Amino acid sequence: MANSIYNLAQADALPLESGNSILFPPLYDIVWSLIPFLIILIVFWKLVLPKFQEVLTEREDRIKGGIQRAEAAQAEAKAALEKYNAQLAEARTEAAEIREQARERGKQIEAELKDKANEESNRIIESGSKQLLAQREQVVNELRREMGQNSINLAEHLLGDQLSDNVKRSGTIDRFLADLDTVAPNGK
């Protein structure tokens, strides 16, 4: 064991004795290490870095394009919303106009129906009045005939004589009815 410790101690002492440092390798190591490093650096610089830049540029363009498309879509949506709101306002205005026209038309129809009803009512009243006057005239004429006949019958009964002369009879009846009309003016 002592021998192995001695060997380790000698190994540590060897690099220091030869003048080589652990921190500073020999020049040939540095040159041979720089050559693969430079080759890798050139390959990286010529092949990997341009592809990486291309991917980054493409991604940046895609992001910018996406933002522009999103802004365009947002502007289009905003324009569509404004158009929709304008159409909605126009539809509401049109609906209000239609309601107002319907109200006015309803009032016109109501007025027309009232006028027609009044005309029909007046026509019915006038027709009823004409019928009533005609019936009244008919009743008055019937009553005159009946009264004439009753007065002749009464006169015959009172006189005890039969009044056979039509001319006398009609003259007597006409005088009686004329007297009756003067007593009750307008046939009332």
Swiss-Prot record:
GO MF entry, a single one:
proton-transporting ATPase activity, rotational mechanism
State the annotated membrane topology for this chain.
Answer: Single-pass membrane protein
- Superkingdom classification of source: Bacteria
Q: Does the keyword Chloroplast apply?
A: no
Instruction: Tell me which InterPro entries the record gives.
Output: ATP_synth_B-like_membr_sf, ATP_synth_b/b'su_bac/chlpt, ATP_synth_F0_bsu_bac, ATP_synthase_B_chain
The entry describes its oligomerization and partners as: F-type ATPases have 2 components, F(1) - the catalytic core - and F(0) - the membrane proton channel. F(1) has five subunits: alpha(3), beta(3), gamma(1), delta(1), epsilon(1). F(0) has three main subunits: a(1), b(2) and c(10-14). The alpha and beta chains form an alternating ring which encloses part of the gamma chain. F(1) is attached to F(0) by a central stalk formed by the gamma and epsilon chains, while a peripheral stalk is formed by the delta and b chains.
| Family note | Belongs to the ATPase B chain family.
Main function? F(1)F(0) ATP synthase produces ATP from ADP in the presence of a proton or sodium gradient. F-type ATPases consist of two structural domains, F(1) containing the extramembraneous catalytic core and F(0) containing the membrane proton channel, linked together by a central stalk and a peripheral stalk. During catalysis, ATP synthesis in the catalytic domain of F(1) is coupled via a rotary mechanism of the central stalk subunits to proton translocation.
What's the name of the protein?
ATP synthase subunit b
Give the gene symbol. Answer: atpF
